[in-house]
Regions:
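Serine-hydrolase catalytic-loop signature spanning alpha/beta hydrolases and amidase-signature enzymes
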Residues: 53-63, 74
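Active-site loop/oxyanion-hole signature of alpha/beta-hydrolase fold enzymes
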Residues: 28-30, 37, 63-66, 76-118
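Conserved hydrolase catalytic core segment
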Residues: 113-152
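Alpha/beta-hydrolase fold catalytic core
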Residues: 1-48, 70-72
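Alpha/beta-hydrolase active-site loop signature
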Residues: 55, 79-83, 148
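Alpha/beta-hydrolase
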Residues: 176-212
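A catalytic-pocket lid/entrance helix-loop region that shapes and gates access to the active site
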Residues: 138-140, 144-173
Length: 212
């Protein structure tokens, strides 16, 4: 899988405009790039921003974005340190203020007056913070798998795998891991599990696979 810029692809169900882009952001440790996918017509003022959970990436929304692209310009970023976005030089920089700052840079890049926001878990928390600000560009906020309060049980479960860096000798082993840690996603089809897995992996110099 390789990065493709400004690409229109023929996808299932007809032609859907699709592009992979990046926007440059700043942190106390320097500059970094945030990657995002854009679905639908770039001139469509009806914009939906979809932001993923703590250990996931923007490609989780591919199926939804493809479905909504006829009516929305759908933007799906990889939060810094995930997916195809850069990593921060300082590991202590992965904080919600940094994530929110990056997303505000992205929203400015879109050059639109308002957006709808769909946030899963961490993406919902980022959305709540931005939506709470005066003159926020978010006009509608949809929360998935998150709310104003987070249970202790949920935090303990996340703590079981966050920060781990597992390596896999085979794709099958990697998919088993993704299915295990992502069980709360629900009864997905085999094709959906394959999609989540493929866009979660990177090939290491030694030939093994690791999570992005």
């Amino acid at each position: 899988m390789s990065i493709v810029s400004d690409l229109s692809r023929w996808l299932a169900g007809g032609p859907v405009a699709f592009a992979e882009r990046r926007v440059r952001c700043a942190s106390p440790s320097g500059l970094h790039r945030v990657a995002y996918t854009e679905w639908g017509e770039p001139e469509n003022p009806n914009v939906l921003v979809c932001v993923h959970g703590l250990t996931r990436n923007g490609r989780d929304f591919d199926e939804l974005a493809r479905t909504l692209a006829a009516d929305y310009r759908v933007i799906c970023p990889d939060v810094v340190g995930r997916g195809r976005s850069d990593w921060l030089r300082d590991p202590s920089g992965y904080t919600f203020p940094q994530y929110a700052s990056d997303m505000m840079v992205l929203l400015a890049r879109l050059n639109v007056a308002s957006v709808h926001w769909l946030g899963t878990s961490m993406g919902g928390l980022i959305g709540m913070w931005i939506a709470s600000q005066e003159d926020s560009p978010i006009t509608r906020l949809v929360l998935n798998d998150v709310g104003p309060l987070i249970s202790v049980a949920s935090l303990l479960r996340i703590g079981e795998y966050v920060g781990q860096a597992p390596k896999f000798d085979t794709y099958e082993d990697a998919e088993k891991y993704v299915r295990l840690v992502s069980q709360p996603f629900g009864p997905l089809s085999d094709a959906q599990w394959r999609h989540l897995t493929e866009f979660s992996l990177q090939r290491l110099p030694d030939g093994r696979l690791a999570m992005r």
